[in-house]
């Protein structure tokens, strides 16, 4: 395969329909929030979704894996390109089950949840980006 087959209108048309990477609730939201430790405002580029350690993490939509490796601050990290400058980012993975350069379908397993995360509980970190700019992932996930 050499291309991603998204609906007409591309990834933009998928807003509000993306597969949740894991079953769980959002425990850290996108945007500016007060840091509980340092009591200062911090901007979060993504969300944390709580999940059981070793739970399967799924691709939110079809695309090409462009990064699948350790990344400081995110543990094991997978980045999927969906074309037109759109990417999804999956961090705090305990294991990665895909390789860079492969194409994945929405709902396909790409890894597992790590035993811990930088928020003190097992959770997957998830971002949606457009041309490098973070977007609110909660607006993109299936409601």
What are these regions (language model features)?
Residues 11-13, 36, 92-93, 113-114, ...:
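Short beta-alpha junctions and helix-cap segments that line functional grooves
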Residues 1-75, 79-81, 134-143:
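Extracytoplasmic/periplasmic cell wall- or extracellular glycan-interacting regions that localize
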Residues 82-83, 93, 129-131:
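Short, loop-centered acidic/histidine patches that primarily coordinate divalent metals
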Residues 100-143:
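Conserved, short, structured surface segments that act as functional micro-motifs
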Residues 68, 86-103, 107:
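Short histidine-centered loop motifs in beta-beta connectors
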Residues 27, 64-66, 94, 111-114:
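Conserved positions in beta-strands of structured domains
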Residues 46, 77, 87-89, 123:
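Well-ordered beta-strand positions in beta-sheet-rich domains
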């Amino acid at each position: 395969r050499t291309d991603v087959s998204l609906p007409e209108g591309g990834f933009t048309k998928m807003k509000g329909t993306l597969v949740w990477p894991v079953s769980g609730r959002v425990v850290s939201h996108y945007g500016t929030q007060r840091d509980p430790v340092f009591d200062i405002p911090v901007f979060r580029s993504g969300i944390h979704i709580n999940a059981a350690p070793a739970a399967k993490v799924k691709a939110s939509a079809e695309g090409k894996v462009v990064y699948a490796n350790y990344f400081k601050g995110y543990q094991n990290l997978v980045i999927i390109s969906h074309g037109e400058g759109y990417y999804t980012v999956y961090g705090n993975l305990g294991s990665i089950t895909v390789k860079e350069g492969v194409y994945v379908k929405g709902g396909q397993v790409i890894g597992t949840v790590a035993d811990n995360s930088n928020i003190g509980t097992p959770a997957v970190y998830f971002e949606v980006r457009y041309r490098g700019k973070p977007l609110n992932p909660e607006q993109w996930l299936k409601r």
